[in-house]
Amino acid sequence: MSTEGSGPVRFPAMEDAVLERWEKEKTFEQSISAREGKPVYVFYDGPPFATGLPHYGHILTSYIKDVIPRYQTMLGKQVPRRWGWDCHGLPVEFEVEKAMGFKSKRDILEFGVEQFNDECRELVLKYADDWRGFVNRMGRWVDFDGAYKTMDNDYMESVLWGFKTLHDKGHVYEGGKIVPYCVRCQTVLSNFEARLDDAFRPRRDMSAYVKFRQQDRPDTFFLAWTTTPWTLPANVALAVAADENYVCIEHGEERLWLAEGCLGGLFDEPVILERCTGAELAGLRYLPVVGEVIDASAHRVVTADFVQMGDGSGIVHIAPAFGEDDALLGQQYELPAPNPVRDDGTFSDAVAQYAGQNIFEATPRILADLKSSGLLFKQEQIEHNYPHCWRCDNPLIYRAVESWFIRASALREQLVENNSQVNWVPEHVKEGRFGDWIRNARDWAVSRNRFWGAPIPVWRCDQCGTVEVMGSIAQIEARSGRKVEDLHVPHIDEHRFACQCCEGTMSRVTGVFDCWFESGAMPFASRHYPFENKQEFEQTFPADFIVEYLAQTRGWFYTMMVISTGCFEQNPFKNAMCHGVILAKDGRKMSKRLKNYPNPMDLMQTHGSDALRVALLASPVCKGEDIKFSEESVRDVVRRYHLLFWNCLQFYKTFTEIDQFSPSGDLGQPLDNVLDHYLLHELAALESDIKMWMESLDFSKIYSRIEVFINVLSTWYLRLNKARIWRDGLDDDKRQCYEVLHYALSNFARLLAPFMPFLAEAVYTELGYADSVHLQDWPSIDRQYLSYELADEMSSLRNLIASVRNVRETNGVSQKFPLRSIRVAGIEQAVLERYAQFLEEELNVKQVQWAADADEWAQPVVVLIFSLLGKRLGPAMKAVTTAVKAGEYVIDEQGGLVAAGQTIQPHEFERRLTVRDTLNNVGIVENMVVWLDLDIDASLKREGAVRELNRRLQDLRKKAKLGYTEKVDIAVLGGAYVDEILVHHEDWLKSQLLVQSLLRSDLEAPLAVDEVELPEGDPVRIQLRRSVLA
């Protein structure tokens, strides 16, 4: 069967049938109601923006969010799975602006804020049905009908409560700070928004070395370097490093001041006229390069500890309105902070020559003007990492803006303490990416000068400036005397009321909440706490589990932690998982424009959702690493997991139907067949391992272990049990085999349920169970079946088989030719004899013999571990190496090696076996040495030929779509070599194929025909049909 679905079973169609069953039987709802009154397992589902269709990042996160609840449900817990929609903020506004053709904020104001917000409300759930269909097709169970929306009044009211709580605890203030600012969206961004995803990306800009003329020395200039020439109109100071040396050099008829440490990068053989420290330059005055002198405190040299001697000139131009370090320095020296840039990123009339021009577009003109006035020393284009808006992709600026802030810096100690109580996956995130971020938490600007969002609940008096913060709709209504119908602007701004301190009127301040503040309030806002569901919230907070991709350590994870710490002094979650990013096959970001990734819905309809689930969750992306995704990885899963397991199931069903077997549940005690015991050991070990690795959320190990079990079942247990199953009749031994198989298949389906929910459901149904596998408890496999000694024996046998096959391949001896014998040393004789028959059948060997030793085939060698010995032995290493190669060493009583007068400790060398030089028919694996008799005589060649003939005829049976029990007629048409083969092996060939008649002439109306190349003789034609005598 191909993974695309041609053949006996098409897995995507099978999944569609399972989906129909779940919908019809309300299986998800049953799984919730069946656990009523049980302990609740809480996981927070980070609400996606509903402004587009799901991508592979959403899909990966959703699969994890499905595995965990399914698993916890099977452990007996109730796991509510409520969906949520992130409705507010720049993502939605930006999409509406694009749809309406708006270019600026002014367009919105002219259109009307109320109408604009109505458009936002309409857009928000435009893709809701598409999301629902997509998530359902993935097989993820979630409650869409009870979804919360951040735009609902109930949710927003809780957001207001959270802000007021933070305010009342002293964690909120209003102030002007340097913050990331988008001139296109005309709003503040938080410091973590400026670092989301790939917000910092390469950008080419013009940098300039500008000459600032010293006030009292017209021929002398301070040389300063800037990468933002547009900030020069706001310059008020030049900063130098107090302890560094600065020099004044001759440059034509001019003199230039710069750091001595920066000379080499700018001048070849400078003539130094003066030398002093930066501290000695402090206080000198200069003339502005753009505009006029601002006031007496400006345009002077000051010292700063952030001035570095790397790139540039060692003199930094200071514009306090456009840099955090600049602003702090301005406060220190009481410098003015002129801001000649409007909200839309154009220069104001304060800079007449550039008024109305975009700051970036004006840069070339600024530089041209500096050049014409003789103040431009040098300009060059640089490529640097520069922050961009996470929604509109325009470059950000850092700008002094009035905003409402959460005092996150004051919460650092509590944030660190709360983080210490969280289990992070990967573990390094705890003290690394997330830990570093909260240890250096900066105050969070939570207000946005936008329209579509929960309102900042602050009212200010127009006369005395008194401020009131509202934490509920009831408070607003009580003060305004009007009913609150909608908390959105402009409706909320109709609520004005008298000031209690004077005769003034209180009106709401402008601005709405950062949408990250709203999503960070999700744990309580989604429950409308504290206005409703108080007990429910308190009993389910903090969450047991959350998962998002790694960048959310500076997004949703962070905002939840800040708000929870500030409001409740509590960590909001106990376990947090961060996954990596899924890149296209070519290693680039997935792009609709580049079409460098397969459509996920098409992929699921081609290979199935379970296959995509395994391909993603088994990959390193679940350990926080980025991966390159390709459709081949999904196709490979179908081959390695689906097909093997499904074929095992069909094999079981076919033969149990033939034998009219019905499982009793009695496995038989004690188990007298070693293969039965081994299969049940593997099942019990699998269940134990899954539980262990679910504790650490190591999905890659779980899926790897699942694959191991499928291989043990398919290529070991069933393969070695074929003779046992194929024999006629249903004796006790065969019945036990069937009982063990049924037990293993049904319990494996239950173990598989959280990880491959569609396949598990289909298999469980095929086994005759009426109830869904997802309504079952987690299986408890009897620990009496665990036998790691037996597992080690089986592992050794598989390794031995692999070694024999490798020696065959190396010597060009086909696996189809039987060997007279192999001899094995390094294994217990009893163990080898116990499994000799298995090995003879699997390896196509006449006789497996035990050997007491392997001295004539292999010799011991000592391998020194140079990485450990090199430093310790030094010059003596050479003599030791020579002695060991010559065999001139002894092993002492402690297991150490003594050579050339040096003692090598046991951990500093290894003792290995190696094949003797003259032998090519010997293999070594673990401590076993196997010798193969590779002499293939005529009789062995005939056996090999008839085995190949049988294999090809079996293929014809499949091609003709004949059942296992149907008898056939075959024709084998060839020369004398075929006659010779059939003389010796005709009866065996007929027994293998259920042959009624074997003819040496053409069949009438054959169902299938083929041509076979045998090791010797001419090509052989083979034909097959359903037996006419059957």
Curated annotation (Swiss-Prot):
It comes from the Bacteria. GO terms for cellular component: cytoplasm. Its EC number is 6.1.1.5. GO terms for molecular function: aminoacyl-tRNA deacylase activity; ATP binding; isoleucine-tRNA ligase activity; tRNA binding; zinc ion binding. GO terms for biological process: isoleucyl-tRNA aminoacylation; response to antibiotic. Keywords: Aminoacyl-tRNA synthetase, Antibiotic resistance, ATP-binding, Cytoplasm, Ligase, Metal-binding, Nucleotide-binding, Protein biosynthesis, Zinc. ATP binds at K592. Its cofactor is Zn(2+). It is found in: Cytoplasm. The keyword Nucleotide-binding applies. The keyword Ligase applies. It catalyses: tRNA(Ile) + L-isoleucine + ATP = L-isoleucyl-tRNA(Ile) + AMP + diphosphate. A motif ('HIGH' region) lies at residues 48-58. InterPro entries: aa-tRNA-synth_I_CS, aa-tRNA-synth_Ia, Anticodon_Ile_ABEc, Ile-tRNA-ligase, Ile-tRNA-ligase_type2, M/V/L/I-tRNA-synth_anticd-bd, Rossmann-like_a/b/a_fold, tRNAsynth_Ia_anticodon-bd. Catalyzes the attachment of isoleucine to tRNA(Ile). As IleRS can inadvertently accommodate and process structurally similar amino acids such as valine, to avoid such errors it has two additional distinct tRNA(Ile)-dependent editing activities. One activity is designated as 'pretransfer' editing and involves the hydrolysis of activated Val-AMP. The other activity is designated 'posttransfer' editing and involves deacylation of mischarged Val-tRNA(Ile). Confers high-level resistance to the antibiotic mupirocin (pseudomonic acid A), an Ile-analog produced by P.fluorescens NCIMB 10586 itself that competitively inhibits activation by Ile-tRNA synthetase, thus inhibiting protein biosynthesis. P.fluorescens NCIMB 10586 possesses two distinct IleRSs (IleRS-R1 and IleRS-R2), each with a different level of sensitivity to mupirocin. Purified IleRs-R2 shows no sensitivity to mupirocin even at a concentration of 5 mM, 100'000 fold higher than the Ki value of IleRS-R1. NCBIfam families: ileS. IleRS has two distinct active sites: one for aminoacylation and one for editing. The misactivated valine is translocated from the active site to the editing site, which sterically excludes the correctly activated isoleucine. The single editing site contains two valyl binding pockets, one specific for each substrate (Val-AMP or Val-tRNA(Ile)). Monomer. Belongs to the class-I aminoacyl-tRNA synthetase family. IleS type 2 subfamily. HAMAP family: Ile_tRNA_synth_type2. This is Isoleucine--tRNA ligase 2.
